[in-house]
Structure formats: structure tokens, C-alpha cells
């Protein structure tokens, strides 16, 4: 099927208008989830304070992880539309049960005679008895926090993305083998991207001699981050790359690959830089050593900050409608959110490119072969 440029623009416009409209529906249906520590407050909230709580909860719903996959919530009936996820915790023994036992954070879950409550920021705490409450001050519970290995919303999307990538690229590999290195179907879309990563990222930064050993990781990390960023643009409250734990894991993996594949020249330039006076070597060595750990940290923060900032900007623009409650502001907010959403598509691909490019730079510096005699002659 062939689309004209005009038809394609219409499809894209409808696609993002639908996303924005669904986001409006999520905002109007989202209820503030009060923590147990605030349950003792009896003061009556004003309409402005209630709206602020709803807006804050709407933002939190889209940027934080959760133990259930919630799509919509009916404010009048209190009905949640979504599905629970498995809870896996360690508290002197392994406990496995459904997140539905928490009843969206309003109930105590029982497992093998122990009782647990879902607290602030989706952390699970042990409580005393079926009616146990969280205790503490300033929203910091003093209850015992258990080790949480649950399949949360972010973990589920990691699995979905991994399966999607396996399905796409295993099919691409089969089409290559079957048709004599000629991609077919959806592989025609991904083949130029694979070649771009190889020819414009891997080879220029790592070199033709060593790039092949890193291609698997570079391709995986590029498409992995890109797909996760695209999922984050949907109104489903998925924000995997805006989770500092996820980006930290990606940064640590890059750090380990760089460290364990580096050659002696790499370590020589760190601990005893050639061509530099000895007093300067003593000063530069700890700085270079610190740089080893700063690089993956920069990778982690760059991706995390850019993605979560984009989500918060979009959510804040949507919230303007319910703050000003005017038709003009509604139209303005909708159009501005539409434009920002389109920019976010570019940012999703750009952040995947930057992460892959920086990883390739680190790998290239780790395997670079230096010729000191020529360089410092």
C-alpha cells in the first residue's frame, strides 16, 4: 500500500491527536492516592487543593513505576481499568502474590501469615496485622521495608521490548539467510538503521579492526533505548527510561564492557600518561581514574534527565487546562502539547543515538592503539 505525503501527514496528526486526547481522559479520571501517613489528616481541602492533588497524582502516574498496570480510573465509581502484576518480595522467605491484594494501595496484603502494605513511591513495608498502618513522620515510614523483586510496570515493558526486538531482528536475520542478504518486510525499514549504526557510529569511533566485537551491544542498546522511549510517548504511564534504576543499569553495563575489554594502552594513559612530565602524571592520574566512573554516570544522568523532563513538560502543559479552566487555554494547551509530542519523537531517537554514540566513543578509547614514539616526537 502506497501513501501520499499528504495522507501520511494526516495519519501522523490523527495518531498524536489521539495520544493527547487519551492523556486528557487519564487526567480527568485520575484520583489522588493518599498515603496512609496522611490518612490521619481531617481538614477539608478546598477545590484548588483537590485539583492540585489530582494534577500531582497525574504527573506521578506517568513518571513513576508501579506494581500494577493501570490504564484508566472512573472517578465516580472508583473503578480501575488495568491488570495486576506479580509481587515477589523477600522477608526471611520468598513471598509471591498478586498486586491486586493491595487494592490499589488501600488494603493490607497477607502472605504466609505476614502482612504488607504498599506505601509512598510504591515501596512495600511490613505491618502488624490485617489492619496494620504505616508509622513515621514527614512521609518517611519507620516500618521494615522488604526486598522487592516484583515484576513492576517498568520490568514488564522491559520484557515486552526485549520480546519485540527478538521477534523483529530474528525475522530480519532469517530473511537475510533466505533471500541472499536482502531484507524483506519490516526488515526493509530497520536495515538502513542497522547500517547507519555500523557505518556512522561504530566504525568511525571504534575503528574497522575492533568494531565487530561491539556491534551486538551497540545495536541492542540503540534499539532498546529507542523502543523504550517510543513506548514512553504513549498515554499508558510507561516511563522506563525515566527510571534512574534502568538508566543506571545501562550505564553500568557500558562501564563493565569498557573496563574488561580495554587494552594496556588505555590503562597506561590513565595511570601514567606518556609524554607528560612526571609531576603532572601524579596530578593527572587520579583525575583520569575518576573519569572512568564519571563517563557511565554521565550516560545514566543524560538519558534519565532528558526523558523524565520531557514527560513532566507534557504533563504540566496538559494540567494548564484544569488550572485555568478556560476554552482558550484548553486550545492553546492542546496545540502546544501536540507540538511538544512531535518534538518528543525526535528526542526519543536522538537520545538513543547519543547513548550509542557515547558508548562507541568509550569503547574506541579503550581499544585504541597508540604509537607514542610518533605521537610525542
What are these regions (language model features)?
Residues 2-7, 21-183:
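Perimembrane topogenic segments of multi-pass inner/organellar membrane proteins
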Residues 8-11, 155, 159, 214-218, ...:
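Alpha-helical transmembrane segments
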Residues 10-20:
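Bacterial N-terminal signal peptides
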Residues 141-146, 197-210:
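Cytosolic juxtamembrane amphipathic/interface segments immediately preceding
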Residues 160, 164, 168, 194-198, ...:
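Membrane-embedded alpha-helical core segments of multi-pass
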Residues 167-205, 265:
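Hydrophobic transmembrane alpha-helix segments characteristic of membrane transport
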Residues 214-215, 220-234, 245-249, 253-357, ...:
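Hydrophobic alpha-helical transmembrane segments and adjacent short intramembrane/lumenal linkers
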Residues 234-240:
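Membrane-interface helix caps and helix-loop-helix hairpins in membrane proteins
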